[in-house]
Design a protein with these regions (language model features):
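PLP-dependent amino-acid enzyme catalytic core
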Residues: 1-107
Length: 107
């Protein structure tokens, strides 16, 4: 990621930030418009940055449907699986959990 991206990060929407970050890993595997749709579906809830002091803030990722930070990753994974499963084959996702993972993935 470029220095310019981080210098101007406050000018980007949540969707734009997510797109620029994930694009580094996805490349051209998912078309831009489809990837934006997946991201929009993933970050449709509020995740505020809360200041702790003048130099430290925290990103609250627990405002999603299951109140787990895993809602972000689980929703993104599910949307990507749907995109790549063009033949509508039955998929099985095996999850081991000791807490909130199951609810986030089941949703």
């Amino acid at each position: 990621m470029s220095k310019k991206f981080f210098e101007n990060i406050d000018q980007y929407s949540n969707e734009e930030i997510a797109y620029h970050v994930i694009k580094q890993f996805i490349g051209d595997e998912i078309p831009k418009d489809v990837l934006y749709g997946i991201i929009k579906n993933t970050v449709h809830f509020d995740f505020p940055i809360i200041p702790i002091n003048d130099s430290i803030s925290t990103l609250e990722l627990f405002h999603g449907p299951t109140m787990s930070f895993k809602d972000v990753g689980a929703a993104f994974m599910a949307s990507c699986l749907s995109y790549f499963n063009k033949n509508n084959n039955k998929l099985t996702v095996l999850v081991a959990t000791s807490g909130d993972t199951g609810g986030a993935v089941a949703r």
